[in-house]
Amino acid sequence: MVKHDSEVELSEEDFYMQRVSMVRKEMKEGASMYPHKFQISHSFQEILQEIEKTSTQFVGEDVVRSAGRIMSMRLHARFCFFVVTSNGESLQVVVDTKEAGREQMAKFLRRGDVVGFTGNPGRTRTLEASVFATDIIVLTPCLRTIPTEHFGLKDPETIYRKRYMDLLINRESRNRFQKRAQIIGYIRSFLDSRGFLEVETPMMNLIPGGAAAKPFITHHNELKLDLYMRVSPELYLKKLVVGGLERVYEIGKQFRNEGIDLTHNPEFTSCEFYMAYADYNDLMEMTEELISGMVENMFGTDTIVYSPKKREERTESVELSFKRPFRVISILEELNARLGLDLSGETLDREETLEKLLSACDKEGLSVEKPRTLSRVLDKLIGHVIEPQCVNPTFVKDHPIAMSPLAKNHRSKAGLTERFELFINCKEICNAYTELNNPFEQRERFLQQTQDLNAGDDEAMMNDEDFCTALEYGLPPTGGWGIGIDRLVMYLTDAANIRDVIFFPTMKPE
């Protein structure tokens, strides 16, 4: 139920019908309810800055024209007081209803209406920063009720489906998306300042290469063929490095036809960069510089408290230290130490090694879905043994070749690759490696991936002969790096769910 100026309670549907009737009546009588334009002379921020210069009651001589949305209204004696918002700022607009023509307009206006006003800035007797309106008009009437900021939106489904309503009344939500833009801007500036070129690559591909993930399939009517929505821009970006663009990056959407949970959404935003003449050691240093510098820039400190809210229920807080250097964990060394194994890169591809790993999974109570490939079994053990240790930013490095089909062999550790993942709060944020640039080795890796794919591993990569051909022209020694922006935003904005940092997350139809 909602209450209006007449103090009569109306249901949402009754309010809608009444409001539609009022607007239609005004339009029928020739009133312009949806004007094309309203010329603004001052933003709310500029008006408030001018008012701040005087701390006593006053009405200025300057005339301002501005506009915003009515978020609350009250009638007191002959005056109607509107709290109007614009771009996150709030301003009181005072209308003297006894002045000619204003009483009828004041009666028509409702909470949620977008209005334009002209008047003099000043302060009321209670010293409230205000504009004393000489004219106020409707720019867009609001036909439906908007929840009050006090009660807010409780239902997550409504929040995600009607983000516009969430943004109207939830200051925390607006701030979170502003910080998201700040984070993306910081990454872009960081790379631009180091000579990287921002590029765009196709989102529809013949082969879904670049990551171990299940793709979405679409169909191109004109070409009469199925295409895959990209799971990563990696292979295209490396082709650009082959073409002589030695430092490139792309910020954009990826699509993975997988599960939805607190930290996964099928459509997500990533940044990937590729840097000729760099290796994964250089990228670890750059990652520390980027992430630690970003946190320092946003919060003025390298230590923050991640305190997520699940709606009104606050979950346990976690202190995260981004102080350099970050902790480093070598995968096989840690698995051996924690599980009492004797794994080595040279023997990882043996059948008895897989049996040892499956036995370790059984002892730890872990179930591995078929097909039980070496990559899947190792991934399960890493998730169980290593990832829970990675609360503060931690590099997990030197992945086995079976887990890293596009990464270069480790220069001193047989069977391993020069790859790392950065974990924060036990979740992967970054993935990077010294790029495999040997076309002979790359073909062999793709062949193994094809075998895994045929065995039922729907996350294995397809063979990309065009990419191998590009490698034959010569990919310089290159470091490649990717970051999941949505997860990073979660941890820097106290979001409990990845859907809280995506304007319009993937949802089932109502």
Curated annotation (Swiss-Prot):
PROSITE patterns in the cross-refs: AA_TRNA_LIGASE_II (PS50862)
Source organism of the structure: Encephalitozoon cuniculi (strain GB-M1)
Keyword terms, alphabetized: Aminoacyl-tRNA synthetase, ATP-binding, Cytoplasm, Ligase, Nucleotide-binding, Protein biosynthesis
Enzyme class: ligase
Any Pfam family hit: tRNA_anti-codon
Reaction catalysis annotation: tRNA(Lys) + L-lysine + ATP = L-lysyl-tRNA(Lys) + AMP + diphosphate
PANTHER family: LYSINE--TRNA LIGASE, LYSYL-TRNA SYNTHETASE
GO aspect biological process, one term: lysyl-tRNA aminoacylation
Assembly information from the UniProt record: Homodimer.
EC nos: 6.1.1.6
Gene Ontology CC entries for this record: cytosol
Similarity section: Belongs to the class-II aminoacyl-tRNA synthetase family.
A GO term, aspect molecular function: tRNA binding
Segment forming the signal sequence: none
Subcellular location: Cytoplasm
Record protein name field: Probable lysine--tRNA ligase, cytoplasmic
Coarse class of the protein's main subcellular location: cytoplasm
InterPro entries: Aa-tRNA-synt_II, aa-tRNA-synth_II, aa-tRNA-synth_II/BPL/LPL, Lys-tRNA-ligase_II, Lys-tRNA-ligase_II_bac/euk, Lys-tRNA-ligase_II_N, Lys-tRNA-synth_II_C, NA-bd_OB-fold
